Amino acid sequence: MKKNFRIEHLGRSFKERLGIWIGEKKNVTTPALWIGCQGGAIPNLTPETIEYLNPNLQFAGILVPFQYHVRDVDVLEKYGKGIDAFMGLTPNQWNVLISPQDPGIDNRHGYHTNKDISLWDAAGNRVPVNFSFYNKALQSMKPDAYVSLCDGETPRNCAHKRICKATTRTLRFLDQHIEQKSNSFIFGAVEGGFDIETRKTTAKQVSERPVDGFCLDGFSLTTSEAVELNFDNDLKQLINESVIPNLPEEKPKLYLGVCTPRIILQFVAAGVDMFDSSYAKLMTDQGKALVFQNTVSNLKEKCSNIVNESLTTQKNDTKCDPEEFDTIDLNNMRYKNDFRPIKDSCICYTCRKHTRAYINHLLATKELLAPVLLTLHNLHHYETFFETIRTSIKNDTFNKLLVLFE
């Protein structure tokens, strides 16, 4: 098995680490962010508008959920050049990661069987997917890496019997993947729901198999639950005591799903290396722009400034959104005459060219340019945050960054 990850620096505060994921197309410094796709494209962006993203940003690559291509396997097989070429992306520019389902939406539950996983296509129709079909799709899509076929339908308070079925089924799928000896890197799905002992056992079982990394799956959080998630109450014991200690340190850990900046930092502190852009996409869909503090320089000063600015806003506007420390809702008419960029210090295309007032107008008139501009800003802002995380780990100041988001 070819080694695809190395640790460059271990932080001093928790289990945070700086690493290099050695992709087929390019190497990526971790912690890293995958840009999530929907329906065969990066949401709201064409291959041309993708070029408006700052070239200095370091994304891990694109995450392509298979559920949007479940009807296209024969087409992709006939095309023969891989999913990135099919999407019209610049050759060899993007690492490609395939996951069975879209981690950024609320998929329907209750339809899996012992032999297959139910996926929902772009039209909302159910498609049963067994291992052979998923494996055929992977051969046609030619990804750099993929998440093993898995049953992650184990929400909080689900029956222990359901958890056991999910873990057994997922391990069986994983063994089938390993037998096929694909050229792509495989992230073995680690299931177990919210059951501490099952998580521990499953982590050990997956770690015994020759996989290239691990995907922490099976929390079954809705998007609204994910935004409200309290890591200390909901996940800390599961992740820090049951999962991470039972996975080998030298292999990368992946978590897919909506993550606020606070949750990202807590996952990083636990030793998780890769994430996806579901949170940025969710905020874009809601007409919100990310504004949380995301740069290395003057973090304390910036934190003070945002508190002062927020207090001033609250004094002048009794309807101030308490989440403005993280986002601003540009649907709100108080931005109708706000001619500032989304964030003064941001150098993304949107902030260099446009104002809050203009985006408020676009949202009010339901103009399709609104989600384009918000996507460009939110992806830029979110990835800049990851650059801040990487720098703080390198400089052994990660604990200070974490404190700012408590």
What is the meaning of each model-derived region?
Residues 26, 138, 188, 206, ...:
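Conserved, mostly hydrophobic/aromatic
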Residues 155-160, 164, 213-222, 368-371:
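Glycine- and acidic
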Residues 1-182, 303, 308-315, 333:
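Non-catalytic, usually N-terminal nucleic-acid engagement modules in DNA/RNA processing proteins
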Residues 35-36, 68-70, 103-104, 153-154, ...:
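Short, solvent-exposed loop/turn segments at secondary-structure junctions
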Residues 1-22, 28-37, 44, 140, ...:
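C-terminal extensions of enzymes
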Residues 171-178, 244, 387-390:
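Structural signal for well-ordered, non-membrane alpha-helices
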Residues 168, 180-342, 346:
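Glycine-rich phosphate/ribose-binding loops and adjacent secondary-structure elements
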